[in-house]
């Protein structure tokens, strides 16, 4: 099979990369009704599979789970989760032939095997759904022409999809229809109903394309969302310890620092995160972030280039064929790093202390978010898509590190994200070592003293922070979410 994106001509590539439209709430007036009375069969019962299924059932849809015979016979975790939550469970042969919509929510590396197994069983005119388009775009999976292919991609982990639904809201979601597979022209109606059934329409839905979702998703997770956090954790910990900081304190400052810092990012973007610093610290964080952007820009661009060309995907799929040798080696090496094996600090670190003593970490977040966003936009991805795949998801990933360090992050994210994370972090750590050697007192582990600042310089820095394109689009999208949550709660 050929990489689907690479079969398109340049005009088609640019059109699909640039497809992104924020959909109005009125476009979801019919809710999930288009799928009511139809049979929806989910393949896979992991975090997305289970939690999307719970939401869809609560929205009035007929949901069941198709699992492999071995998973049922051996009563594996997927079988237990589905049955314990009261769902009908059966084999592919038992459930797929009756399905109007088959939703493939298995890991990326299983998609080809799953699709080859279920496609011959699907009835004429059925629909096939994904929550990530890797199999269609990068693998180039060929789907029968009578089958409609759609995507609903919540921009949050599965647990968050469920919790927000239970609160009467939802999570921002991308939806798309594969242009090669919409024989009856009903793809958008199916995708909208599925998104509404998960609650996504209450938080904001972007009409996108399989191509735009895949290319932006890969870029975000490899760079700022996972790769930058991993590289930053390892570099900052080693720097602190080398300068005499207690390893336990250093570990806690970093492990929980990312979450604390990005919570401000979540509420008010880079502007609010930077506003949590004193004026001297803000000026220093800005200067550091500009240095970091200059150093890391070629690395970010290389990742984007390799994603666009398909070089990244072909390399990762070669590792799949080699029993994940690279992935497993990198995972083992990460587990042995000094940061991962450091003792726990039993003392308390106050919220403001994370900001005051984490100026470098804030600079890394700012630089990484802006670089990821800028690089995606320069490659033809629309700003709204770039925002969701950079700034929006960062607090969610930072939260996984707060739970069990890098181990937890790499367990929670997909194998695709984990592989890309290692590619980036293994290149980024040595790239930034000379920069780390030139840091000043107050950049990390101690606070920058209060002092006079130049008013004109502070004004210009504040203007530069607030006028960045990601701050403009972020303010708009966060406003949509706030307004929609207010409407949802009131309703």
From Swiss-Prot:
It comes from the Bacteria. Substrate binds at residue 414. GO terms for cellular component: cytosol. Belongs to the ketol-acid reductoisomerase family. Pathway: Amino-acid biosynthesis; L-isoleucine biosynthesis; L-isoleucine from 2-oxobutanoate: step 2/4; Amino-acid biosynthesis; L-valine biosynthesis; L-valine from pyruvate: step 2/4. SUPFAM superfamilies: 6-phosphogluconate dehydrogenase C-terminal domain-like, NAD(P)-binding Rossmann-fold domains. Its EC number is 1.1.1.86. The keyword Ligase does not apply. It catalyses: (2R)-2,3-dihydroxy-3-methylbutanoate + NADP(+) = (2S)-2-acetolactate + NADPH + H(+); (2R,3R)-2,3-dihydroxy-3-methylpentanoate + NADP(+) = (S)-2-ethyl-2-hydroxy-3-oxobutanoate + NADPH + H(+). This is Ketol-acid reductoisomerase (NADP(+)). Involved in the biosynthesis of branched-chain amino acids (BCAA). Catalyzes an alkyl-migration followed by a ketol-acid reduction of (S)-2-acetolactate (S2AL) to yield (R)-2,3-dihydroxy-isovalerate. In the isomerase reaction, S2AL is rearranged via a Mg-dependent methyl migration to produce 3-hydroxy-3-methyl-2-ketobutyrate (HMKB). In the reductase reaction, this 2-ketoacid undergoes a metal-dependent reduction by NADPH to yield (R)-2,3-dihydroxy-isovalerate.
């Amino acid at each position: 099979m050929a990489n689907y994106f690479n079969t398109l001509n340049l005009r088609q590539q640019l059109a699909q990369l640039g497809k992104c439209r924020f959909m109005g709430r009125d476009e979801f007036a019919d809710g999930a009704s288009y799928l009511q009375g139809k049979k929806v069969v989910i393949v896979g019962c992991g975090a997305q599979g289970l939690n999307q299924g719970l939401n869809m059932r609560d929205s009035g849809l007929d949901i069941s789970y198709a699992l492999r015979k071995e998973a049922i016979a051996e009563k594996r975790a997927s079988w237990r989760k589905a049955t314990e939550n009261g769902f009908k469970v059966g084999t592919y042969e038992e459930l797929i032939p009756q399905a109007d919509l088959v939703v493939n929510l298995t890991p990326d590396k299983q998609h080809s095997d799953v699709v080859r197994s279920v496609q011959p069983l699907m009835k004429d005119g059925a629909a096939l759904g994904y929550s990530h388009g890797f199999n269609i775009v990068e693998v180039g999976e060929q789907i029968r022409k009578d089958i409609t292919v759609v995507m609903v991609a919540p921009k949050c982990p599965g647990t968050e999809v469920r919790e927000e639904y239970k609160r009467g809201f939802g999570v921002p979601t991308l939806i798309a229809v594969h242009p090669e597979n919409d024989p009856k022209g009903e793809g958008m109606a199916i995708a909208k109903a599925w998104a509404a059934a998960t609650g996504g329409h209450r938080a904001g839905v972007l009409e996108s394309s399989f191509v735009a979702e895949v290319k932006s998703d890969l870029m975000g997770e490899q760079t700022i969302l996972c790769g930058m956090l991993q590289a930053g954790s390892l570099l900052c910990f080693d720097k602190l310890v080398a300068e005499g900081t207690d390893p336990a304190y250093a570990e806690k400052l970093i492990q929980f620092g990312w979450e604390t810092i990005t919570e401000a990012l979540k509420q008010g973007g880079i502007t609010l995160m930077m506003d949590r610093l004193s004026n001297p610290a803000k000026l220093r964080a800005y200067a550091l972030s500009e240095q970091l952007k200059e150093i890391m820009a070629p690395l970010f661009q290389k990742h984007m280039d390799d994603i666009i060309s398909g070089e990244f995907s072909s390399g990762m799929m070669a590792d799949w064929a080699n029993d994940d040798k690279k992935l497993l080696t990198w995972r083992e090496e990460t587990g042995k790093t000094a940061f991962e094996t450091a003792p726990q600090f039993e003392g308390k670190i106050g919220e403001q202390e994370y900001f005051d003593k984490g100026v470098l970490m804030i600079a890394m977040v700012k630089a990484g978010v802006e670089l990821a966003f800028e690089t995606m936009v320069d490659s033809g991805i629309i700003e709204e898509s770039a925002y969701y795949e950079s700034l929006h998801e960062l607090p969610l990933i930072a939260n996984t590190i707060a739970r069990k360090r890098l181990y937890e992050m790499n367990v929670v994210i997909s194998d695709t994200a984990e592989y890309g994370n290692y590619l980036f972090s293994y290149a980024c750590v040595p790239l930034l070592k000379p920069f780390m050697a030139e840091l000043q007192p107050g950049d990390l582990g101690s606070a920058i003293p209060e002092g006079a600042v130049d008013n004109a310089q502070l004004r210009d820095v504040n203007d530069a922070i607030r006028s960045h394109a990601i701050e403009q689009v972020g303010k708009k999208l966060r406003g949509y979410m706030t307004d929609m949550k207010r409407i949802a709660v009131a309703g």
